[in-house]
Regions:
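Substrate-binding groove of N-acetylhexosamine-processing glycoside hydrolases
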Residues: 1-176
Length: 176
């Protein structure tokens, strides 16, 4: 009782060429990566198992709240093109701000049958693989961190992209 587990595995498959990704794995790691992939297939069951033992779940799905993703859309500020190319983990699919915002913590994992009771919260992560200074960190955090906060603190029925993007634009001067 009182335990908390983190659920960070994100296994949603998009329209991507997984064989191309496999081709990029160095030969000496292919066997271990195949074992890792097989092991990770069981991860979606983890929250339900934890809940059955009275643990609460912190949702931290890498596909939505891992802030080291490269940006998909171009920056409105052309001086940021070099940062956009350099920063972010290349192994992760590039994503738009909207893609990282549009998820529902209450329906993310079907093994969490009573999310109001069993989800302790959400968590964003950044591992800084490509970050060399504070400016780099800010570039990857903003504006995505604001979306993570809103998803964590608001009822999902109050989080709509068309309304959020207006609020988000108004916050931009605060990040200068």
């Amino acid at each position: 009782e009182g335990d908390v587990i983190q659920h960070w595995i994100y296994l949603k498959q998009k329209n991507e060429d997984s064989s191309k990704k496999k081709d990029n794995i160095p030969a000496e790691y292919k066997e271990i990566m195949a074992l890792f992939a097989e092991f990770m297939k069981e991860a979606p069951k983890d929250p339900g198992l934890g809940i059955s033992k009275k643990a609460k779940v912190i949702l931290s799905p890498s596909g939505y709240v891992y802030l080291d993703h490269k940006y998909l859309e171009p920056s409105a500020d052309s001086t940021q093109n070099a940062e956009q190319e350099r920063l972010g983990m290349a192994a992760y699919e590039k994503q738009t701000i909207q893609e990282m915002y549009d998820w529902d913590p209450m329906t993310f994992n079907p093994t969490v049958e009573n999310p109001q009771k069993d989800v302790a919260g959400i968590e964003a992560a950044i591992w800084c693989e490509t970050i060399t200074n504070f400016r780099d960190l800010q570039f990857l955090l903003m504006p995505r961190l604001a979306g993570v906060a809103e998803k964590g603190w608001s009822k999902v029925e109050n989080t709509h992209w068309d309304e959020y993007k207006v609020r988000l634009g108004a916050q931009a001067p605060l990040w200068e």
